[in-house]
Amino acid sequence: YIGAGAFGYSTCKTIEIPASVTRLDKEALHGDFTSITFAEGSKLESIGDRAFRGCDITSLILPSTVKSLGHKVFQACDSLVSVEIPASVTEIQTDTFDEYFDADANEGSGNVTFAEGSIFKLQDGVLYDSENLIRVLDWQENVVVPEGIKYIGADAFNAYSTQTPNNMETLKSITLPESLVSIGKNAFQACKALESITIPKNVSEIGGGAFSNCSSLATAEILGPVKELTGTTGVFLGCAALKNVTLPDTLTNIGT
């Protein structure tokens, strides 16, 4: 493997990772590399947190053996315009692509392609696997979540956690599918342009802070058998415009 920070702040510009390397530890290639390639027959399986931090590469093709990607793998890779993810990848973190899809990055930055057969897909700028909405990568004004998605993960549209504050004003509407059963904590925190939300009939769990600080949210309709609206952060905390709320008769607890 290549250990943590092995090439940190190196003046090297090009590197070919030997086929024998199975793991890149955190910040393993942190530096000014303009070219990163992988030897034929690569056995690489794991890429650690911020592994390519600050690199000046414009494109990257990961080997077909890679299984997992850590946190903020492409952090501050402002020249990177193309990443190809193989179908072998089965583990991606919520923030794997954070600070790669950056409002301050070079124009065109943020093109991720998943190989045919991958369990992951990008649709309208949102990253999914077969059942989960993982994270928004490229913010849009209107999002329709496809049928079949059961879970919206924590921080999925959290405008505070994406490192790009301008996104707070982007999302104006989102349509949720009937298949949805759970919304994670802080899922839509600080989506300040969101004006209304209808939570479908099969949703039984809404995490704390899910819609907190959605300052334009005026209408919220909860149709599912939710029993609690609790958490360390209130589900609708800071929703100053909220005037119309429909709650289910299954609700037994509101608070923290």
Describe the role of every protein-language-model region.
Residues 1, 10-23, 32-46, 55-68, ...:
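Structural signature of tandem-repeat unit edges
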Residues 3-6, 25-28, 48-51, 70-73, ...:
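Consensus positions within tandem repeat domains that build extended binding/scaffold surfaces
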Residues 131-137:
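Eukaryote-biased recognition of intrinsically disordered, low-complexity regulatory segments
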